């Protein structure tokens, strides 16, 4: 029994070192050995009661420490905002960050049940086939013809600088419909999942009607088209599309297209405070996000819009699970918990969970405009601020206090964007690039070591698609993925935009809506420097 006691004392001296280091597994092995030794001694009747009590108490303390540490790791989001000091960030901006990106609506923190992980086999040959088909142009398929102006605009759809506003103008305010159809065609989703073209067009048009229902300045069909294109860019240029199955790519594009369907132009908190029907329906939990998914799926109950009619039962269920998780993850109040969970996953030896990674991609795309060119970013910011101010007007009419950034007379636009970039956008895109590196680098290394690639991989590496003007699209094989360039480009653009906001903040935060000269000057400056 002495050896057991000695080992216990030694373990006590190293417990906390192991808990915070990389030798946690070793600690558990030693603790397991002690407990098994005690069991054997109990069986033999050779037990020292004092040592037995000491070891059991110690085992309990270790388990309790681990439980507390794990609970704190999963639930504590306060530290994510701990570096927002009152003397460096205006109180209004700090309140907005806290109220928007954390769940602090008077609800008790409660450990959420771990969602079942969605696991599927990565079909390499299948992936190779769909990538080879991506750039097969089908501009004049039955049911949808592309106007010449739309064809010209969509030539830039693979670029980060893609101008969705130009597409919306070229398409007669149907940017979402053409973006959905374009990507479903490029990824060969129509053929692969036997999607009736008439259903796809009817569904896309119904989505546009829903996005236009409340005439929102920001959360409208243009935003949906922008997020969908951004998701496409991320999948394409990080190589993530090589990691995903065709069903998962369908889920990504579909979720992006519907993620803000029938958005009311007001926040979840506004719905909760006004006790709206949708807040009552969803019990104040991710109110709008639940509605977006539910309403979009309700459309597909109509036969003429049922784009998923030919999916197998398993595929339909798997896709729905993915779409629900992705869209609910766009609830900004879960931002810090989502970031923390992914960051913790990166520290684990096993691979990243597909559904959670896909959710991160959609979330990043949803808040990506500060990482776009100043011309686009500034335009999106002005639209979002006007939407906030319209909510503030409603709050004033109802006698409610102004939500953060919703008072058009006092809101500091530049400061809010600086805070948004510092505490939300930069960490999100940093995590996105770290995640894609962990996923894709092993795939690139494996691909380069394969002397005789599979049929699909071989066809994928040589894939080039012919465009309308007879030229070739770029090579988007695994070998062509340049994660360093992807990361550096984002960092540079975000930094440039932040500096521009700092310049505006230094000018004294003029009201961008009352001072039209400022807005016009900014847009002219953006045009000359874009």
From Swiss-Prot:
UniProt GO BP: cAMP-mediated signaling
What sequence ranges are listed for the domain PDEase?
142-508
Species assigned in the record? Bos taurus (Bovine)
Would the keyword Zinc be found if you checked this record's keyword annotation? yes
> Subunit details for this protein?
Homodimer. Interacts with YWHAZ.
Q: Where is the active site?
A: 219
Per UniProt, the ranges with Polar residues bias are 451-471
**Cofactors, names only:** Zn(2+); Mg(2+)
Q: Does the keyword Zinc-finger apply?
A: no
Keyword field: Calmodulin-binding, cAMP, cGMP, Hydrolase, Magnesium, Metal-binding, Zinc
Bias (Basic and acidic residues):
510-530
- For region Calmodulin-binding, the annotated ranges are 24-44, 114-137
**EC number assigned by the record:** 3.1.4.17
Q: Which PANTHER family match?
A: CYCLIC NUCLEOTIDE PHOSPHODIESTERASE
Name the record gives this protein? Dual specificity calcium/calmodulin-dependent 3',5'-cyclic nucleotide phosphodiesterase 1A
The entry marks the following residues as binding Mg(2+), namely: 260
Question: Gene Ontology terms, cellular component aspect?
Answer: neuronal cell body
InterPro entries registered for this protein in UniProt: HD/PDEase_dom, PDEase, PDEase_catalytic_dom, PDEase_catalytic_dom_sf, PDEase_CS, PDEase_N
Which SMART domains does this entry report, sorted A to Z?
A: HDc
Q: What does this protein do?
A: Calcium/calmodulin-dependent cyclic nucleotide phosphodiesterase with a dual specificity for the second messengers cGMP and cAMP, which are key regulators of many important physiological processes. Has a higher efficiency with cGMP compared to cAMP.
User: What enzyme category does the UniProt record give?
Assistant: hydrolase
Region: Disordered, residue numbers = 450-471, 502-530
Kindly list the GO molecular function terms attached to this UniProt entry: 3',5'-cyclic-GMP phosphodiesterase activity; calmodulin binding; calmodulin-activated 3',5'-cyclic-GMP phosphodiesterase activity; calmodulin-activated dual specificity 3',5'-cyclic-GMP, 3',5'-cyclic-AMP phosphodiesterase activity; metal ion binding
